[in-house]
Amino acid sequence: MPLLDSFTVDHTRMEAPAVRVAKTMNTPHGDAITVFDLRFCVPNKEVMPERGIHTLEHLFAGFMRNHLNGNGVEIIDISPMGCRTGFYMSLIGTPDEQRVADAWKAAMEDVLKVQDQNQIPELNVYQCGTYQMHSLQEAQDIARSILEREVRINSNEELALPKEKLQELHI
């Protein structure tokens, strides 16, 4: 099985919260696509609660679009990581990490402004696969934890696992 890019970086050295360019590629028409790792939690030490990450998923995508789309950037998708330590964001364009970090912080401020669970988009049986698994309070706790800390930049070069280590791990 091919080794995915996300498994070639050393998760024991990742900082959080932090932005990392996880992958860049071009479409057949030459459009740049960038995938960002938005790491909310230190891997293997912190994890977002399932109700909070689910609510954040509903809020974060719209708020990030409000703050990041434009000037050659259009978000395709923002999805939570299965490990519940962050989100992957795929977009058209190549914004730098600081622009992404600034938009992320602004989006977290927006999460804190939501006053009632009824304001969560698509929170109904028709548009959400587990519409009862939400917590605005947990989502706002996550947002506060991001805003209380500096959003850093994780570098692929600094986090790259040496080839010897990958071989040792039988990858």
UniProtKB/Swiss-Prot annotation:
Residue stretches spanning the membrane: none
GO biological process assignments: quorum sensing
Taxonomy, superkingdom: Bacteria
EC number: 4.4.1.21
Pfam families: LuxS (PF02664)
Binding site for Fe cation: H54, H58, C128
Co-factor note (free text): Binds 1 Fe cation per subunit.
NAD among keywords: no
Reactions performed catalytically: S-(5-deoxy-D-ribos-5-yl)-L-homocysteine = (S)-4,5-dihydroxypentane-2,3-dione + L-homocysteine
Keywords, sorted A to Z: Autoinducer synthesis, Iron, Lyase, Metal-binding, Quorum sensing
Needed cofactors: Fe cation
One MF annotation (Gene Ontology) recorded for this entry: S-ribosylhomocysteine lyase activity
Disulfide bond sites: none
NCBIfam families the UniProt entry points to: PRK02260.1-2
Family: Belongs to the LuxS family.
UniProt subunit comment: Homodimer.
Function: Involved in the synthesis of autoinducer 2 (AI-2) which is secreted by bacteria and is used to communicate both the cell density and the metabolic potential of the environment. The regulation of gene expression in response to changes in cell density is called quorum sensing. Catalyzes the transformation of S-ribosylhomocysteine (RHC) to homocysteine (HC) and 4,5-dihydroxy-2,3-pentadione (DPD).
Listed name of the protein: S-ribosylhomocysteine lyase
